[in-house]
Swiss-Prot record:
Belongs to the complex I subunit 4L family. NDH-1 is composed of 14 different subunits. Subunits NuoA, H, J, K, L, M, N constitute the membrane sector of the complex. Keywords: Cell inner membrane, Cell membrane, Membrane, NAD, Quinone, Translocase, Transmembrane, Transmembrane helix, Transport, Ubiquinone. InterPro entries: NADH_UbQ_OxRdtase_chain4L/K, NUOK/Mnh_C1-like. It is a multi-pass membrane protein. This is NADH-quinone oxidoreductase subunit K. It catalyses: a quinone + NADH + 5 H(+)(in) = a quinol + NAD(+) + 4 H(+)(out). Gene3D superfamilies: 1.10.287.3510. One of its GO terms (molecular function) is quinone binding. Its EC number is 7.1.1.-. It comes from Helicobacter pylori (strain G27). It is found in: Cell inner membrane. The gene is nuoK. The chain crosses the membrane at residues 1-21, 28-48, 64-84.
Length: 100
């Protein structure tokens, strides 16, 4: 049987993968993907703890995070599309062009 520790280990590994992606990548789109991986890792942790404590609070937090992530993707991808149309690049280094 898969225990709580297994879920939390998977959640921690996914979070570390997302964090490494956030720190290593210079592409805005890949930063969004890394953020989504981190949020899903948090959801796995919340749901696993919620299941094993028989409390629905963790599942409610997970649903709230899913709603926030969906709005983040909608707004973020819109901004990424506008960014690409204007600068023809998705690198973070081109953010210096925004300085006054």
């Amino acid at each position: 049987m898969i225990g709580l520790n297994h879920y939390l280990i998977v959640s921690g590994l996914l979070f570390c993968i997302g964090l490494a992606g956030m720190l290593k990548r210079k592409n805005i789109l890949l930063l969004f993907f890394s953020t989504e991986i981190m949020l899903n890792a948090i959801n796995i942790g919340f749901i696993a703890i919620s299941k094993y404590t028989h409390n629905l609070d963790g599942q409610m937090f997970a649903l709230f995070i899913i709603a926030i992530a969906a709005s983040e993707v909608a707004i973020g991808l819109g901004l990424v599309i506008l960014w690409f149309k204007k600068y023809k690049s998705l690198d973070i280094d081109s953010l210096n062009a925004m300085k006054g």
